[in-house]
Amino acid sequence: RIAIAGVIAMEPECIVLDEATAMLDPAGRREVLDTVHRLNRERGITVVLITHHMSEAEDADRVIVMNDGTVAMDGTPCQVFSRVEELHAFGLAAPDTVELLYELRQAGLPVALDSLTVDQCADTICRALGAAEGK
């Protein structure tokens, strides 16, 4: 947190954070991510966030998955996280909401894998169950 404060004081155009939330408790992780989002929104600072936690990338404009030094996936969070099997092949997991929808799809419920928030996920499940009842 102190290192991030020092970088902010220099007023950069771009900040690169490599595993910035590693070793932080959930509250500390949220605080760092909120600060990063605020810097991007309010000051227009470009933020490159390097993380193994896919949930930290949910709010990004763009997600790039690297594998052995090459770009394996590149797109919006919805585009990348909906490719659950490919993420698994790289040893990564999609956000919990997408993983839940993926499991429901595997069980036969026709759901899209594009819900990143809990509310979106709940709406997707309710719509799918409502459609299934209507049959």
Language-model regions, residue ranges each:
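Helix N-cap at the start of a conserved alpha-helix in ABC-type nucleotide-binding domains
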Residues: 26-28
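ABC ATPase "signature
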Residues: 74-75
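Catalytic Walker B motif of ABC-type/P-loop ATPase nucleotide-binding domains
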Residues: 15-18
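Conserved H-loop
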Residues: 44-50
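ABC ATPase nucleotide-binding domains
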Residues: 87-135
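A short, proline-enriched helix->beta-strand linker immediately N-terminal to the Walker B motif
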Residues: 9-13
